[in-house]
Amino acid sequence: MKRMGWAVTAAVTTIVLAQSSLAAQAADSTSGWRAPSCTKVTGDGAVTFTTDDGATLAPTTGTLQSVSYTHGLVALDTPNTLLATHNDELQRSTDAGCTWTKVATLGSGSTWLTAATGGRAFAWEKNGGYLARVDGRTVTKLSSPSADIVGVGTDKARRDHVRLAGSDGQLYDSTDAGATWKPLGKLAFGPGASVYTVSFDPADLDHAVAGGMTTGGAVTTDGGATWTAATGLSATAGGKSNLFAASVSPADRNVVYALGIDLVEAAPNSGAEGRHLYRSTDGGRTYTRIVDDTPDTELTNSTLLAPSPVDPNVLYFEYGTYFQAYGTDLYRYDARTGKVGKTHNAHDGISAIAFNPARPSVMYLGLEEVQIHH
């Protein structure tokens, strides 16, 4: 049965003081970035922004006109520059998210983005083989070492150093910006495992968290040379679990947020789905349940996880559906209180979230259109 008692509050419109002070630190350390100066976003409607945790969204000049997903969205270290992937389009903004223009057509209709240093990013197809490097407005197609990519990580200290993970749990390493690759370390769960995700620590490529089908989670801190099985994903000792997604907090490498299912709890005829959000404070070795799948906090197997870049206690996640024109809930979990705040908008979903490097209270949202509304 689902555990009860998660407190859900109404629209959260302020950022806690601790995060405000951290945001000031971020502004000091982020050269050239500023908050968007516009009140309306010029673009096709794929990206908007909010300054109040989603209580209000900046209107857009365009409206999404077809089934659309914006899976890729990153803020670069080039001042005021962001990239987004809307279906097979690569879009770019150079004014902190006020204006978006198409710069290229990509070789996949569904691509994620991982930012690198020097104004670079990598575009990649989740559970597919498409891979490209984006330098400014130039897109260079790369050969992926895996036909089923489940994660890409970059090195802040070495611009050309990038890692990639395949759905078998194998890591690959490149020191020439993705031109060539070599296998690295051992399989995350051994031969025959199906891996949903590998999340790389943005501060340390050697630290990565893997999630698998029935195998739960695993973590490496030595670039895949060794992997340690995670505990706490099932309430039953030795119980199996699925770990669909994980994200290492940019604010504290010891904090990892994850999405999974306790397969013991979700056993046939149990009446429970066993779906939860989890939090680890030891880098992904042990997890504690923090949010259950309830009518107040809806979770799916693909719930988006977006940890705050400045506050390791804060996680944003979302639930959206076109069914009965429900719209989208944007949630904010705070580990200090265990409470979840919620705001609502009319869009069909949020596919991606990025944060303004100088003003982390400015959140950029990649939007979905699943059913055209007339």
From Swiss-Prot:
Alphabetical list of InterPro entries matching this protein: WD40/YVTN_repeat-like_dom_sf (IPR015943)
Protein name: Dispase autolysis-inducing protein
Other noteworthy facts: On the 2D-gel the determined pI of this protein is: 7.1, its MW is: 39 kDa.
Function statement: Induces autolysis of dispase and thermolysin.
Main subcellular location: secreted
One cellular component (GO) term of this entry: extracellular region
Assigned keywords, A-Z: Secreted, Signal
Stored CDD domains: Sialidase_non-viral (cd15482)
Record's subcellular location: Secreted
Signal sequence range: 1-26
Gene3D superfamilies, A to Z: YVTN repeat-like/Quinoprotein amine dehydrogenase (2.130.10.10)
